[in-house]
């Protein structure tokens, strides 16, 4: 009896439909007739209050558990009119119960199949229900109501079980076979109830988990949005700071590069400037020395030739004894050897110079030695420039100084001076006749004179030492120098002549071109004048212009002749 009343209470509507399809109509009629006892008054009151108390929940939710109170009410209403019939037909019902109990055993596997289908359908319906109701509060309320309904359903079941037990105690007429079967039936009913409760709990657990996940997701979404907003704000705050830092770093790097470039340029500029100055200074004295050597190489040869000619005349005119002449000749040979030896030391072996010119070259060296201890490097460079640019002192000044500052000289030296006097005279004449000497050279000579006064004594000592050493060398080199000097002089003269000829030719060509232009202009003028004469009668002005034309041509020819004479 208890089993007949518990099945329609716990099984939902979906399972009832499946059971109806599986079970035959004869069985359903038997089950309806097997309900002799109605629900007690307490169960009926609870169902009424349950229907009145939760109308909203039945409207909102589509949970399969909401159909349970309606089913219970239907079952409660069914036994009302059947009460009298069941009381009349008790012995018939007992027989039917025995038959049902025998048939119940094969129907139990069908009930298990229905439960498996129910388990598969229930989670799908629950998922649809959760998708429709997204708000967590409504879902929590629905769960609470469902649990309350289940508890309410279990309470009348327990009451109903108690009533069944009382009825069984009051019915002593039941056969012994039935009484032995009742505890077994009770055990089966309890096992089924436990299974159903366990299934309901299993269905509720995924619902609670899904709700919990939904709540977590909803809580996490605003938190993630807040975190994103905070990160975005932080990035916005940090971006200007990063930009400023980058700009500052770039500016500092650019300044460092700019300063490095300036320092490099400043360090290179003085080096380049010094290099240029040194290069110019090194080239200027070389050019100046080359010019001096070329001039000096030409002058001493002429000077030596004139000396030899004058010495021969003096020997013929003198009536002194032969010993005196021998001494003079010996001294003259020694002097010539000294001159040649001294010229070799400062200059190349091909160049021929006088001893006085050698002294002039030694004087700046001594002067530089003194200045190196007194002045700095800059003054040394300036002095070197001056020394290279200065021209040699004239020969007259040296001769006069030697006469004044050498009173202790022997008679032989006096005779040498008397022989040098005509050379000095010739030097004067050469200086007077040299057109190439400029005012700048004279100023340099005047600046060069005080330096010679300082190194006179040292030069005398050097002359005596060089005199002894140069005797053996000069005799061998005289002939070679003479031949080489002539060849060099000839080559230099030829080169100079060629250069002068080229310049003159160019000048003549330019002048010829200018003359031709002037002639063309004159011809044009004459043609214009003729045209004017034809149109206008002749006047005094036109007559004056005609005799002037040949005069211009004459002046041009005279200028050409003068220029050619100057070139020659």
Curated annotation (Swiss-Prot):
Family indicated by similarity: Belongs to the involucrin family.
| Assembly description | Directly or indirectly cross-linked to cornifelin (CNFN).
Question: Where are the residues of the annotated region Disordered?
Answer: 23-499, 517-568
What is one GO cellular-component annotation here?
A: cytoplasm
Post-translational modification here is noted as: Substrate of transglutaminase. Specific glutamines or lysines are cross-linked to keratins, desmoplakin and to inter involucrin molecules.
**Basic and acidic residues: bias regions:** 49-77, 89-106, 193-213, 266-333, 345-456, 478-499, 517-532, 551-568
This chain's function reads: Part of the insoluble cornified cell envelope (CE) of stratified squamous epithelia.
User: Which Gene Ontology terms describe the biological processes this protein takes part in?
Assistant: keratinization; keratinocyte differentiation; regulation of antibacterial peptide production; response to UV-B
Recorded protein name is Involucrin
Give TM segment ranges: none
The disulfide bonds in this chain are: none
Tissue specificity, in the record's words, reads: Keratinocytes of epidermis and other stratified squamous epithelia.
Residue ranges under compositional bias (Low complexity)? Answer: 25-36, 78-88, 107-121, 133-154, 172-181, 217-232, 457-467
Modified residue Phosphoserine is at which positions? 472
Look up keyword Acyltransferase and say if it applies. no
Task: Keywords in alphabetical order, please.
Answer: Cytoplasm, Keratinization, Phosphoprotein, Repeat
Which InterPro entries is this protein grouped with?
A: Involucrin2, Involucrin_CS, Involucrin_N
Q: Where in the cell is it found?
A: Cytoplasm
Organism this protein belongs to: Rattus norvegicus (Rat)
Q: Name the gene for this chain.
A: Ivl
């Amino acid at each position: 009896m208890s089993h007949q009343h518990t099945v329609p209470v716990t099984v939902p509507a979906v399972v009832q439909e499946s059971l109806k399809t599986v079970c035959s109509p004869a069985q359903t009629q038997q089950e309806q007739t097997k309900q002799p006892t109605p629900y007690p008054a307490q169960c009926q009151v609870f169902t009424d209050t349950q229907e009145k108390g939760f109308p909203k929940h039945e409207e909102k939710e589509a949970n399969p558990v909401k159909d349970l109170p309606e089913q219970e009410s239907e079952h409660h209403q069914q036994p009302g009119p059947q009460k009298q019939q069941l009381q009349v037909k008790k012995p018939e019902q007992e027989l039917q119960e025995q038959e049902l109990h025998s048939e119940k055993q094969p129907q139990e596997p069908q009930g298990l199949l229905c439960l498996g289908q129910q388990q598969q359908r229930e989670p799908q319906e629950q998922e649809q229900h959760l998708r429709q109701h997204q708000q967590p509060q409504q879902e929590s309320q629905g769960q609470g109501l469902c649990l309350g309904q289940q508890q309410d359903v279990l309470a009348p079941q327990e009451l109903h079980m108690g009533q069944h037990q009382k009825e069984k105690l009051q019915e002593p007429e039941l056969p012994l076979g039935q009484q032995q079967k009742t505890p077994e039936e009770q055990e089966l009913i309890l096992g089924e109830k436990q299974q159903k409760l366990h299934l309901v709990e299993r269905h509720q657990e995924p619902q609670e988990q899904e709700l919990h996940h939904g709540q977590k997701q909803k809580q996490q979404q605003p938190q993630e949005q807040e975190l994103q907003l905070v990160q975005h704000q932080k990035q916005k705050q940090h971006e200007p700071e990063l930009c400023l830092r980058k700009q500052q770093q770039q500016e500092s790097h650019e300044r460092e590069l700019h300063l490095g470039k300036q320092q490099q340029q400043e360090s290179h500029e003085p080096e380049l400037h010094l290099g240029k100055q040194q290069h110019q200074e090194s080239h200027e004295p070389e050019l100046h020395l080359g010019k001096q050597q070329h001039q000096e190489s030409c002058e001493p040869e002429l000077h030596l030739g004139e000396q030899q000619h004058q010495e021969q005349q003096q020997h013929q005119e003198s009536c002194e004894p032969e010993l005196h002449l021998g001494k003079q000749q010996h001294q003259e040979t020694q002097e010539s050897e000294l001159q040649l030896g001294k010229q070799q030391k400062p200059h190349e072996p091909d160049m021929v110079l006088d001893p006085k010119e050698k002294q002039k070259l030694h004087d700046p060296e001594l002067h530089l030695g003194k200045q190196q201890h007194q002045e700095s490097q800059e003054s040394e460079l300036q002095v070197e420039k001056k020394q290279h640019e200065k021209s040699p002192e004239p020969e007259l000044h040296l001769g006069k100084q030697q006469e004044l500052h050498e009173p202790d000289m022997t008679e032989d030296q006096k005779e040498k001076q008397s022989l040098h006097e005509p050379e000095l005279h010739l030097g004067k004449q050469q200086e007077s006749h040299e057109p190439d000497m400029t005012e700048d050279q004279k100023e340099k000579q005047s600046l060069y004179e005080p330096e010679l006064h300082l190194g006179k004594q040292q030069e005398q000592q050097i002359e005596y030492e060089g005199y002894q050493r140069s005797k053996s060398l000069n005799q061998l080199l005289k002939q070679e120098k003479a031949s080489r000097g002539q060849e060099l002089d000839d080559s230099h003269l030829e080169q100079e002549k060629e250069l002068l000829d080229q310049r003159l030719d160019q000048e003549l060509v330019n002048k010829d071109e200018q003359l031709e232009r002037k002639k063309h202009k004159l011809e044009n003028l004459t043609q214009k004048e003729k045209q004017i004469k034809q149109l206008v009668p002749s006047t005094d002005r036109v007559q004056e212009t005609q005799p002037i034309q040949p005069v211009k041509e004459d002046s041009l020819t005279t200028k050409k002749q003068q220029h050619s004479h100057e070139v020659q």
